Amino acid sequence: MFVLSERCKALRGDAVNEKNFAAKICAQHAFWSKWGKVTLDPSKYSNITLNAAGTASVMRNAAPVIADGELIVGYNFGDGAHSGLTGDRGRDTEIFRRNGFTDDQIAWYYNPDNQVKGYTRLPPTENLTEKEHQLRAELTAINSAGNSSITANHSVIGYEKVLRLGFSGLLEEVNRYAVINGESDYYTALRMICEAGCVLGENYAAEAQLIGRNDIAEVCRQVPAYGARSFREAVQSLWFAHIVNTWEDDINANSLGRLDQILYPYYRHDIDSGVLTDEDACELLCCLWIKLYRDYDVQQSCVGGRAPDGSSQVNDLSYLMLDVTEALNFVRCLSVRFDSSTDKAFLRRALEVVGRVRKGIPFFFNDDVMIPALTAVGIPYEDACGYTQIGCVETVIPGKSNPHAVNSRSNLLKAVEYALADGYSMFDPKLRPGAETGNPLTFESFDMLMEAIKAQIKHIIRATANVAVSFMPNSEVNDPKPVKSLLTEGCTERGIDFN
């Protein structure tokens, strides 16, 4: 059982009591993202370079803020790129000033000539059936939000590549594949991210030096520009990579993956070398957990699981992450993977955390069910064994997929309505968006009603999938993701975007 250090108690108190950096950071993303996009060289202009220029500008220019007592530095911007701004120019002008922006910079931001000029390809509709059009028209059977193409956030990308190579190593990889595949806006965009990633740590190192935090300065001179050499550098590099990902398209369910597997080699090296204790490791993990809590938006992570050879992947970090979750005693998304052969001591410890924290965490995933379910839909066995969770526990293969986890939504209660109305809408009787399952007055048993409901469910799900697929060809044009592309297997190698 880990006992919180005085440092962690203070940082936890600041986070729980919402003492944050809002006065210093809330306008940083809004200004610097716009600056990067508006000042982009027109000769390099496309949607993917536009998005990269905005994110890279934030990486290069956002103020490096270091709180008292922090071991891990860097910050998210709340839920939304403009979190903290009010929409009222007078009030927001004061916010910009508190963020250190000059009156000339504020005037530039509000100048109507300084607009971001992207372009949008409208989604096609000709491939949808009449019933699918009607289902969408209701907005209650498919995607109540009225947007059938949610292509932002909800990811687990290959953070371990940043830990291993640093952004300088990733830049070398981008340059190598640009030669193989030919130069394009895609590789220009990825270079922008890599080059800015090499600056990000230096900015924090310089700030740390100014305030006498030489320990932070030493770490940030190494990461994220170069590969991590220690557990502390690995945690810091992971956090930098994660906030860059959230700076691309907000926090919402952008998640971290199997942290006990990603960080374990660095932990093991430092423990074996005698330069790290479990107490040190827990304190660093506490700092990471607090960072994730401060701007909480279901940033999921996972411990445990089964390797392809059938062996358990539970390790010492799996236990330490449970210890930290219990000690901090706040809602911090964490999942536990297990199977029939998992050490009962590990399961007991996870269940103790559930009972003591009493906030519904951790979540549990049974590999004996999940892995066969993934292979059954064509995912290779080794990849299936590496599955993890996004946000509200959607399943993903980390660093190897774009799951479109919340791309369209189905209202399955409509299946009951349609079954009771032979496919007609009760909101608009002229519409018949449901399947034709027969007049319910002819149903002679409850089983017949259930069969009709099941048929309507299949109809709604199939239509939802068709609508989502019809939008997907537009995602690359409308919403390219250079950061996620950089850290997703197959994208850089083939010159294709994450979306």
Spans of model-derived segments:
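Conserved catalytic cores of very large enzyme subunits
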Residues: M1-L190, L210-N499
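Amphipathic alpha-helix face/heptad-repeat signature
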Residues: L190-I193, G197
